[in-house]
A protein has these predicted regions:
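A generic secondary-structure signal for well-formed alpha-helical elements
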Residues: 59-62, 89-92, 113, 117-121, ...
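C-terminal, beta-rich DNA-binding module of retroviral/retroelements integrases
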Residues: 144-179
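Short small-residue beta-strand/loop micro-motif enriched in glycine and branched aliphatics
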Residues: 35-40, 93-95
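Residues immediately flanking
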Residues: 9, 32, 72
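Short catalytic-loop micro-motif centered on adjacent basic/acidic residues
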Residues: 39-41, 67-71
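Mobile-element integrase/transposase regions
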Residues: 1-28, 36-37, 48-57, 61-66, ...
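A short acidic/small-residue loop/turn micro-motif
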Residues: 31, 43-47
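RNase H-like two-metal-ion nuclease catalytic core shared by retroviral integrases
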Residues: 70-72, 76-88, 92-118, 127-133, ...
């Protein structure tokens, strides 16, 4: 666990805020070995600030990985990301362009998220991002505790992740916030 975390962004549904429809962007990090979603949140903007919030959340709750693997999107491939990796001691890998198979686990999670949850949402179901994120967190909790057919003994992502909890490298909240 915490060897590689894959990160990516997907389009979420439209939600209506103050009478206007807004596209939601969902950023997720997934642990390669356990399939645990270490962090996931929806935003109205797909940018580095949003990505940083997700990374800090993941490290706060699950420790730090040895490697982040991202696609080549602008918010992932930035000088700020290089500096972040150096500050916290995490290597950063960028997948070759137009090769979704190089980050297949996060892409598969997004497909599951869309087929099981996002497809049910209508634009008028949500009127603020906080409520949407609350429900998204509930879905992630369910996902992380559901047995996964590709894991040993059909373990859940959480069970697989915490089976090796002794190797989690935690960071102080102060260091996370300074990153």
């Amino acid at each position: 666990i915490n060897e590689v975390w894959y990160g990516d962004t997907t389009y979420g549904p439209y939600i209506t805020i103050d009478g206007k429809k807004h596209r939601v962007y969902i950023i997720a990090l997934i642990d390669d070995a356990s399939r645990k979603i270490t962090a996931c949140e929806a935003f109205l903007e797909d940018n580095y600030i949003s990505l940083m919030k997700v990374i800090k959340s993941g490290i706060s709750s699950c420790g730090k990985p040895k490697l982040f693997s991202f696609d080549n999107g602008a918010n992932y491939r930035s000088n700020q990301m290089t500096l972040l990796g150096a500050r916290i001691g995490v290597a950063i890998n960028y997948c070759p362009a137009y090769t979704p198979t190089s980050k297949a686990k996060v892409e598969r999670f997004f497909l599951t998220l869309k087929n099981q949850y996002l497809c049910l949402i209508k634009p008028n179901d949500y009127h603020d991002l906080d409520t949407f994120n609350k429900d998204l967190r509930a879905y992630i909790q369910k996902y992380n505790t559901t047995p996964h057919s590709s894991l040993e003994d059909n373990m859940s992502p959480n069970d697989r992740f915490y089976k090796e909890s002794n190797i989690i490298i935690e960071m102080s909240q102060e260091k996370i916030e300074k990153s």
